[in-house]
């Protein structure tokens, strides 16, 4: 889970709208890395935290880092391909689902599980469950990475993602981080959920700041080259 205040505020707001206290809610994530997101979920006071990662060494390290919480059954660490494991673990009691397993150093065939994860979840989630997709700004601009076959960002195009989510009757929000280099896509079947006004205004500001991402990725140079090629 990201440390973005905008995102954590959205999570709290969603749970409140669903009348589910944080301390009684369950958080599921795909993509563990060093376990910082598990720590954040603990700090937010989730009752149960589940993390799936294909990297055994990451799971082993996290088992040591969170050994007391694992022993107390507050944290469950699952090793395996997230697009398969999520089908085994998912149930209606999970409130927040954070998808961040895209990219790993273990198996190139599984670096982009997002498409299968989303397809499964959208067929099974209820109105009290929120799906969060990390790195959405990179997916939205996947054409910047289309020449890199080994990058997860080239495996799921923005067009493909839009097709997957467009017919599901979803309430959709794009939440930008204050860093200007990331944003999250939030999906829910809860039509009554709305972002609070202050958060909405803050998100507009963060959207403007996201120009940093395009600057870092040489977006303007990229578009200029495309224009020159077109004119020639």
For every predicted segment, state its role:
Residues 1-96, 102-232:
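A short alpha-helical cap/connector motif
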């Amino acid at each position: 889970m990201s440390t973005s205040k905008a995102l954590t505020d959205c999570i709290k707001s969603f749970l409140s709208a669903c009348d589910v206290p944080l301390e009684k809610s369950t958080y599921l994530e795909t993509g563990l890395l060093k376990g910082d997101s598990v720590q954040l979920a603990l700090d937010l006071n989730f009752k149960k935290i589940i993390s799936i990662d294909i990297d055994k060494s990451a799971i082993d390290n996290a088992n040591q880092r969170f050994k007391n919480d694992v022993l107390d059954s507050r944290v469950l660490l699952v090793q395996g391909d997230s697009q398969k494991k999520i089908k085994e673990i998912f149930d209606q009691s999970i409130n927040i689902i954070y998808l961040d397993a895209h990219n790993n150093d273990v198996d190139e065939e599984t670096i982009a599980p997002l498409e299968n994860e989303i397809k499964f979840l959208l067929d099974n989630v209820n109105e009290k469950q929120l799906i969060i997709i990390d790195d959405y700004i990179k997916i939205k601009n996947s054409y910047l990475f289309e020449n890199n076959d080994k990058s997860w960002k080239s495996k799921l195009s923005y067009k493909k993602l839009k097709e997957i989510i467009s017919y599901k009757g979803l309430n959709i929000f794009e939440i930008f981080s204050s860093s200007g280099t990331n944003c999250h896509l939030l999906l829910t079947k809860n039509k009554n959920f709305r972002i609070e006004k202050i958060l909405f205004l803050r998100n507009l500001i963060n959207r403007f700041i996201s120009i940093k991402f395009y600057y870092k990725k040489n977006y303007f140079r990229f578009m200029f080259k495309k224009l020159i090629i077109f004119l020639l």
